[in-house]
């Protein structure tokens, strides 16, 4: 996110202090992937679907088309994983993360980011969803996802709009 948005984040000590200061009210969610394991799972899933397609024969053309689309999606993932320039694909790689601070009935997602190498994986959606679920379990009624850039072509707006947000504009913002 730093490189993509041309911003500079704070150092590790700052984030450790933030998490220590807010204790149980600080939520840190991180998504990981083991690329080597993911590739094996993709190949296994692809083989299972291909077996299912073969078993269908000429019947159920709609189901066959759906299964073929799944195979195509899996093949794209395999190409993505194979193209990654990662030293050790057997180690877990961070895909995305978010830090949320809960206070009373409100919570604020104050930092979030993703590894650009895995931009085609929807991991950030799960991180945000899990963060919001946990906040709700803590009694939070409203979670702020932070701002948007005020441009309808902004990818951040596209991402956040998938959570059915209530966009609040304050005087003097735009």
Descriptions of predicted regions:
Residues 19, 98-99, 132, 157, ...:
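Generic hydrophobic alpha-helical scaffold/packing signal
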